Amino acid sequence: SFDVIIANAGVMATPFGHTADGFETQFGTNHLGHFVLVNRIARLLRAGGRLINLSSSGHRYSNVDLQDPNFERTPYEPFVAYGRSKTANILFTVAFDKRHRDRGVRAAAVHPGGIKTELSRHIDPSHTQAIIDQINRHLAAEGRAPFQWKTIPQEAATSVWAGMVASADEIGGRYCENCHVGHIVPDFEHHGPR
């Protein structure tokens, strides 16, 4: 049995491709892989257990498009694909939390923050700075501090906080960042990421 499952496999901004199962690479890896694994082992989570799905602030790039998850009708855009997969992680978290809370198991989606890892290997360094500039514009509009890279312990902190420290009711079905519940995106207030 498990106390906590942290679903943390992921790729970002990959060239267009498909998984061995035929799904667009990012959606298949970042969302469907977690979805299948977690649902196969969910019964092993003890009462009081938690599921932590690693998502990203990149969920803001796109909603999920279940009519065209493999980009068969729309041009492939790496960050749109990444956003779709990370939004799907959050929506899965909300549904998992609703489905399992009666048995004492809760779920949270976590944005670990920006950290320099192999995750960004497909991104040109000049594009990275453009992304940071865009993030900082959004943060400034929200009255928040500018982006800073995190260390590995800082990156892990929100997963540990949501999985072990925060109250279950505080994090259940919610999106967390910087060891707090994240800001609500108004369009999703009643039916999605909270």
Task: Go through the PLM ranges and name each one.
Residues 1-128, 135:
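Rossmann-fold NAD(P)H-dependent dehydrogenase/reductase core
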Residues 1, 187-194:
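Short, intrinsically disordered, charge-balanced linker/junction segments flanking boundaries
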Residues 85, 134-186:
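C-terminal helical subdomain
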Residues 31-35, 89-90, 152, 156-159, ...:
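Short alpha-helical patches at coil-to-helix transitions and adjacent helical residues
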